[in-house]
Amino acid sequence: MSRGRLLSVLGAVAVVAVVVIGLSQTKSDNSAPKPDTFDLAAAKRSLAGAPAPLAALHDRSNTLIPADKQVYAGEIKGLAGHPIVVNKWASWCGPCRGEFPVLQSTSVKYGKRVAFVGLDASDSDSDASKFLGHFPVTYPSLVDRNSHIAQSLGIGRSFPTTMYYDARGKVQYIHQGPYTSDAKFAADIERYALGRPS
């Protein structure tokens, strides 16, 4: 192949690469959070009558709470006697964005029996607040700005990550990656948080 022809082929490949990259970036821009149809007020009403520690979480629904390792430990200790699901997320995490509708619906389904706590890691307050404006949840999120809590739990690198504590406060399972169906999330809650064999 002549040098001129080779340069022409390489130029064509470069143009195709630029077009593909441009289209993929446009697609990712379209995946930004969109207003959700989840009705937080109705969800909270459906959780009325939950045990006091769980009701206290619902009272702080959709809030960001500054935290450190001691605050996290206190939150878990205060939920003693109840199974706990902790979901680590960030506003910039595409898989987290895809998972939140599953978290919304399933946390309402189990919210009278299981404590749900968010862990917003490596994020900014303003971006996290905007994210929760699009994807409100019936539980608070502890803010782990520098991922110190996540690192101490051994879940510092993967987003999203979901931890399951049994009612004694013992970690039973850590799921890395997003839940894409209510059924899979519910099955893991039943098995690892509630201790019911599948």
Q: Model-derived features: where do they sit?
A:
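Thiol/disulfide oxidoreductase modules built on the thioredoxin-like
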Residues: K130-T138, R145-P197
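Extracytoplasmic/secreted envelope proteins and their assembly/folding machinery
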Residues: K69-I76, F100-S107, D125-L132, A150, ...
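Conserved redox-active cysteine motifs that mediate thiol-disulfide chemistry
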Residues: K88-S105
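Conserved segment of the thioredoxin-like fold in thiol-based oxidoreductases
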Residues: H58-D59, G98, V108-K109, V114-N146
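A short beta-strand-turn-helix
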Residues: D59-I84
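N-terminal targeting signals for export/organelle localization
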Residues: M1-P66, S198
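Hydrophobic beta-strand anchors of alpha/beta hydrolase catalytic cores
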Residues: V85-V86, F116, T162
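Second-shell loop/turn segments in exported
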Residues: H58-T63, W92, V117-G118, Q176
